[in-house]
Amino acid sequence: FFLARVKFEHALRNTTLTPSSSRGVLYKRAHFSLTMMNVMKCLKSYVLAHEYTEETILRYFFSLAFLSFLTHELLHLMSALIFPKYLFGEKKWEKLAKHRRAQVVHAPNQILNGLLAGQVVRGSLERFPSAMKKNGKFDVGRRLETTTRGGGLFGGFLNLLTKGGVLGGKAVTFRRTTVLATAASCGYLMYDFLLLTIFDRKNMLRAHGRRQYMIYIMHHVLPLLMWPVATRYGTFEYFVAWGVRSELSQAAMGLRTVCIGMGILDTIYGVIVQLNFVGVYFWVRMWPLLDHVRSMAKADWFAENVPRWQLPFAFFTVPVPAMLNVYWWFMIMGAVWKVVSGGNKKKKEA
């Protein structure tokens, strides 16, 4: 699959788009999309038929993640076909800079990831100190529970999709909602990581700038390495679930990116989208911050149900998302202040 994707992108970049070559590109895209859909169908059959246990949770997790990855690849291809012709128009699309086009085509993936992962994980969220032990310590390790997991708007869908996660009548891994949302988010992160580093590196680097580009690389690598480990051993679910929840702001960011590409960010609709992005970011990333800090301070890091070899990684990876959220919040507030104070207008006049 990976080699087919590379060959397709290489052929697309090195083809002069005449009417005949355009048909060839469309044919290749259709063939590639059909291949992905067949793989997704096989994975879906496996996921629906599989009842995961503690020993098989990783295989189940990666199957879901790969299904999510293929979904995002397919959505990216569809966006590249639909946006230039139907949403923007070919003339308007040609006027956009290449890095701006790349961002706009990527926006639907951000929206899908934010809505899917950010909403599905809602059933797993809890506020500190609801998971504290009697000794006043926050339990970050595995908890055995007999309660039914899932529920809410996605309950029926999750029960159909996950079918299990129990061993001897007790849950021994993450909540079903956490497993599904985390796997879906990891599939998106893998798609975006390959886009950043291989498939569209030049445009992504220009769009984000070198510093933000490197931050995004680190932001993607850490969850891809640590979330599967945490899922396998049932540890640090509180922090993982809230990390996935923060992806909800990606949906608002993707909508904002589309507005920028269409040139309507300064209209009343653009203002609503901007305010929505700031509000959602604060809601899912900044509002829970105090709970996160208290949880890290009160966490029982050396509990018996936490493998010792995980501790060095946890001490580094758990605080990083909170620090990045604060850093990005100050960047957002700086941009808001420029708009309010008229800094952008003065710069244009100069």
Regions found by a protein language model. Name each.
Residues 1-3, 20:
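Low-complexity, disordered terminal segments
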Residues 253:
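Nucleic-acid-interacting cores, centered on viral/eukaryotic replication and modification enzymes
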Residues 33-245, 257-350:
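Membrane-helix and juxtamembrane interface regions of eukaryotic multi-pass membrane proteins
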